[in-house]
A protein has these predicted regions:
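Flexible phosphate-sensing "switch/lid" loops adjacent to ATP/NTP-binding sites
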Residues: 1-173, 189-351, 356, 363-365, ...
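Short clusters of small/polar residues that mark proteolytic maturation junctions
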Residues: 372-373
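A short, polar/charged loop-to-alpha-helix boundary motif
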Residues: 376-392
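Hydrophobic positions on the alpha1 helix immediately C-terminal to the Walker A/P-loop
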Residues: 185
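Short HxH-centered metal-ligating active-site micro-motif
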Residues: 390-422
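The conserved Walker
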Residues: 177-178
Length: 493
């Protein structure tokens, strides 16, 4: 992988900048933490060299100065809102986050339940927190929010909210997902701190869009592609342009709410420390890009991946037609198309010549390998085997797993487990490869080289099974599928 981002430089710069911002406000900063704190694979894909855990590593460098508050919207508890990427409810994710933070040595003990209006499930969750020894606080709906500044910044607004007791100079406010009330929590705390005579400030930390990259830089376009379902648009920050004569990039929701936010801060603190939404941010990611072309190429690939993901989701659910149209527009803006990766045309050609579903993958050295549907292995399994051979320097015609190993597994599937598909999925193929490695050193070599496939792009001529897709993602392989099924059925796993 061609490195375009200096992760160590980023961690150092980011920590220094946050410390500067703490000092700017007299020693106390409420930092709204947007996006993913850990496992930020989008950032690692579009900024090659960015570690998925870079943000949490940066926070660990400030560990003695930071404490964490987790916000959750009472309405999300009531609706049992689920995190799509994890398949767990927001309230369960609060507990998961607390476990992770604590295991890393962070000070985390406070949960704030926002938009609380006596929701029964929120009451039950609070009782559960109390039984675990976790302190929780209630923040209430405010009539006229966010535009009725007089009411909001008063004893009838933020004044009604419970003050969250904190002791460290940096208070990171995070949440299971968007709409949890992170910003409102920070501003409510500023109101209460100010009434107590404590100097404190607010800032926002989000990786994307990167404010000091051009509006139409592929990295920023890739952010729009990733959030296409949120209707986020990157725009030039007009407030920053007017105040400083500098062109910077922000997203539409932050720009739209800035005049209101500025008025709130003026009311709370007497004056606003910020002249623009860009001023509010602390993101230093743009300063750590060391190879712009590498980041451009990586981001272009991500835009195309998002297109295929959305096209497949539209085929599966019937939802997302307008999102797909927007992604086509974003691809045009980035001057890329669906054939950006040579693996796609290779997969389609393989299907055309064999008359059955096929796949292709571009390996780290740029070579493209293919996999076809056979009597014992599906396309995903065949491609995985050929890719492992490719990165291991093994002849792709060599049968590393003998039919004597494969056939009993296929027999078990069809005769005893009553599967209609005798072919092995990719996870089953890896197990067969593992069994073979006991007596076959080449099989062991293939397993040892599996990590070399991380970051590769695989394309399939049909939508592959969820089992195969999950295994590929576990190996760190990016998967794109043509939006069509192998068989015409109403139900697909």
């Amino acid at each position: 992988m061609r490195i375009g981002f200096d992760n160590e430089k980023y961690i150092k710069l980011q920590a220094e900048h946050i410390r500067e911002r703490i000092g700017q406000f007299g020693g106390k900063l409420y930092l709204e933490f947007g996006g993913k704190l850990f496992d930020d694979y989008h950032a690692s894909r579009v900024l090659p060299g960015f570690a998925p855990d870079a943000k949490i590593s940066m926070l660990k460098s400030l560990i003695d100065e930071v404490e964490i508050v987790i916000a959750i919207n009472a309405n999300d508890i009531e609706k049992s809102k689920v995190r799509g990427d994890l398949g767990i409810t927001y309230d369960e994710d609060v507990l998961r986050l607390m476990d992770i933070f604590r295991s890393m040595g962070f000070m985390v003990g406070n949960v704030v339940i926002t938009q609380y209006a006596n929701q029964p499930d929120a009451d039950a969750f609070r009782k559960r927190l109390t039984s675990m020894g976790i302190t929780s606080y209630l923040h209430y709906p405010i009539a006229g929010y966010p535009y009725d500044i007089d009411r909001i910044v008063s004893d009838e607004g933020y004044g009604k909210n419970e003050f969250i007791e904190t002791s460290r100079p940096l208070v990171v406010v995070t949440a299971p997902g968007p709409g949890s009330g992170k910003m409102a929590t920070c501003l409510s705390q500023l109101y209460h701190e100010n009434k107590r005579g404590v100097a404190a400030g607010y800032a926002k930390y989000e990786t994307f869009p990167i404010w000091n990259l051009p509006l139409n830089h592929p990295v920023n376009i890739a952010y729009e592609a990733a959030t296409v379902d949120l209707d986020d648009d990157n725009i030039i920050d007009p407030f920053h342009l007017e105040a400083y004569g500098e062109t910077t990039v922000n997203y539409n929701r932050d720009v739209e709410i800035f005049p209101v936010l500025k008025s709130m801060m003026e009311r709370i603190q007497g004056e606003s420390p910020y002249k623009s939404p860009t001023d509010m941010g602390v993101n230093m990611a743009g300063m750590a890009i060391v190879d712009d072309e590498a980041c451009r190429e990586a981001a272009e690939m991500e835009i195309v991946r998002r297109y295929f993901q959305t096209a497949v989701e539209l085929k599966r659910t019937g939802v997302g037609e307008k999102w797909l149209a927007k992604l086509e527009m974003l691809m045009n803006r980035a001057s890329v198309n669906v054939n950006l990766s040579p693996a796609r045309s290779a997969a389609l050609l393989k299907e055309e010549t064999t008359g059955a579903p096929a796949g292709a993958m571009q390996l780290p050295d740029g070579t493209v390998v293919t996999g076809k549907t056979g009597p014992l292995l599906g396309a995903a399994s065949a491609l995985l085997m050929n890719a492992l051979k490719g990165v291991s320097g093994v002849d792709d015609k060599l049968d590393v797993i003998s039919d004597e190993v494969l056939e009993p597994i296929c027999h078990l599937k069809t005769e005893h487990l009553k599967s209609q598909n005798p072919r092995l999925h990719s996870d089953e193929t890896l197990l067969a490869l593992s069994i073979s490695s006991v007596t076959n050193p080449i099989a062991e070599q293939l397993i040892d080289n599996a990590d070399k496939l991380r970051g590769c792009d695989a394309y399939f001529s049909v939508i592959i099974s969820s089992t195969d897709e999950k295994l590929y993602r576990t190996l760190g392989i990016n998967v794109c599928c043509e939006p069509k099924y192998e068989q015409h059925r109403y139900y697909h796993k």
